[in-house]
C-alpha cells in the first residue's frame, strides 16, 4: 500500500529536500503540495488528498492546517518551529483526535544528542549546563527550536530555568542558558556543555546538509500510519532503535 504524503512548505529549503529524497522510499509518494504563497483554503485540498501531511512552513498557517486535518482525518508531521504557547496548545488539543508528531529536529543525530544529554544530566548533577547553537544567517527564530527542545529534554531530568539572555547578570545555579550564533550557510550545529570545576564535557551534533532532517520526516510520516491519537515526538520514533542498540553487549 502506497502512503500519500502531502507536503506543506514545498518550495522552502526543507520542502525541496524532501522532494529530492522521497524516491528513496518505495512505500510512499508526494500526493499534494502547498506553499505559503497560495490561498490557505487550498490546505483543504492538501489534506483531502493525503494520508499524512509533512509541514515545514510558517507558524501563521497552523490553525488552518489543523482545521483541514481534522476535517479530513489527516495525520500530521510538524517540523515548523517558532510556535507560540497558544499554538502548542492547539496542537495538543488536535492530538486528542489525530495522531500528530511534532519535533523541532527530525534527524536521528539531534535526537540521540538529546537522549545522551538526558543521561549525562542524571550523572553530572553538580555541573553547570549550557547550550550553544549556530545556524545560517537567514534563519528567523533564535534560539533555534532544536536548542529549546534539547534544553527541555535536560530540564525534564533536572529542575532548571531556561534563559536566553542574561545581559549583565551573573549565572544562577538553577538555570540552563542558550546562546545563538547566526552567519554563513550553517545547516545547524548544537553543542551541550557540562561545565564542572575541574573538567568540561561537550556533546555536539552538526548537520552537514538537510538530508537527515528530510529522511527523518519521511520516516516519521510512515511510522505514524498505525499510531493511535496522541502527540508524539521524534524520540518516540527513535527510542526503539536506541533501546535496541543499548541492549547490545559492549
Swiss-Prot record:
(S)-2,3,4,5-tetrahydrodipicolinate binds at residues 136, 145-146. It comes from the Bacteria. Catalyzes the conversion of 4-hydroxy-tetrahydrodipicolinate (HTPA) to tetrahydrodipicolinate. It is found in: Cytoplasm. Pfam families: DapB_C (PF05173), DapB_N (PF01113). The active site is at 135 (proton donor/acceptor), 139 (proton donor). It catalyses: (S)-2,3,4,5-tetrahydrodipicolinate + NAD(+) + H2O = (2S,4S)-4-hydroxy-2,3,4,5-tetrahydrodipicolinate + NADH + H(+); (S)-2,3,4,5-tetrahydrodipicolinate + NADP(+) + H2O = (2S,4S)-4-hydroxy-2,3,4,5-tetrahydrodipicolinate + NADPH + H(+). It is an enzyme of class 1 (oxidoreductase). Belongs to the DapB family. InterPro entries: DapB_C, DapB_N, DapB_N_CS, DHDPR_bac, NAD(P)-bd_dom_sf. Its EC number is 1.17.1.8. One of its GO terms (cellular component) is cytosol. GO terms for biological process: diaminopimelate biosynthetic process; lysine biosynthetic process via diaminopimelate. PANTHER family: 4-HYDROXY-TETRAHYDRODIPICOLINATE REDUCTASE, DIHYDRODIPICOLINATE REDUCTASE. This is 4-hydroxy-tetrahydrodipicolinate reductase. NAD(+) binds at residues 9-14, 79-81, 103-106. GO terms for molecular function: 4-hydroxy-tetrahydrodipicolinate reductase; NAD binding; NADP binding; oxidoreductase activity, acting on CH or CH2 groups, NAD or NADP as acceptor. Pathway: Amino-acid biosynthesis; L-lysine biosynthesis via DAP pathway; (S)-tetrahydrodipicolinate from L-aspartate: step 4/4. PROSITE patterns: DAPB (PS01298). Keywords: Amino-acid biosynthesis, Cytoplasm, Diaminopimelate biosynthesis, Lysine biosynthesis, NAD, NADP, Oxidoreductase. It comes from Rickettsia bellii (strain OSU 85-389).
